[in-house]
Amino acid sequence: MTQDDPIARALDGIRDLYAGNLATHGRDSKSVGWKDEASQLVRFDRLARVVDGRDAGCTANDWGCGYGAMFSFLDGRLGDALTGYTGYDISQDMLDAAARSIDSPKARFVLGREVTGEADYTFVSGTFNVKLDTAAADWDRYVKDSLRAIYARSRRGLAFNLLTTYVDWKQDTLFYADPSEFFDFCKRHLSRYVTLVHDYQLYEWTMLVHREPSA
């Protein structure tokens, strides 16, 4: 990406937006754009369903990890079955907040715009929601290219969420995705084993993509 690239410009703006949120709210769900912790936990619960119950141990990548809330959730749910976690983010401020609050040998945090290492599962929560003034078609292409790259580094599965198009109104700076279109994309380009979760109270959906049939 170059500075003339609309995606690069958007990512710079998103980085600054979240750094400002963190300065205002601290290590709180509002800093990463969520209404409250309760709704954040609902999202994490849906995403974590990608983990196969037969797994004796697994590693996780978290792309757009913010201050590391997903690690705390996964560590609490999986315990010793979570053997390693890498959180990626474009905001050094967010990563510093994560490192200050999370003291675990299982967790590490990496600054970057791409996932560079493999893991059993990759989680992407809210990372694609803000597009700022980027054209929707450009952002859609960026999301799908990113999902291809992330899935290539996911040994067992990928879980991500996006804002749904089934809403009463839309905000211009946010990206809304048709769940049926993305289900088709995942089936055609990622895996035969795809689950769309769109039965919870938030204005979004979650996609679970497995390399093998789930338990």
Describe every region a protein language model picked out.
Residues 1-29:
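N-terminal, positively charged/glycine-rich alpha-helical extensions of SAM-dependent methyltransferases
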Residues 109-118:
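Short acidic low-complexity segments
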Residues 128-130, 163-168:
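Short "lid" loop at the C-terminus of a central beta-strand within the Rossmann-like core
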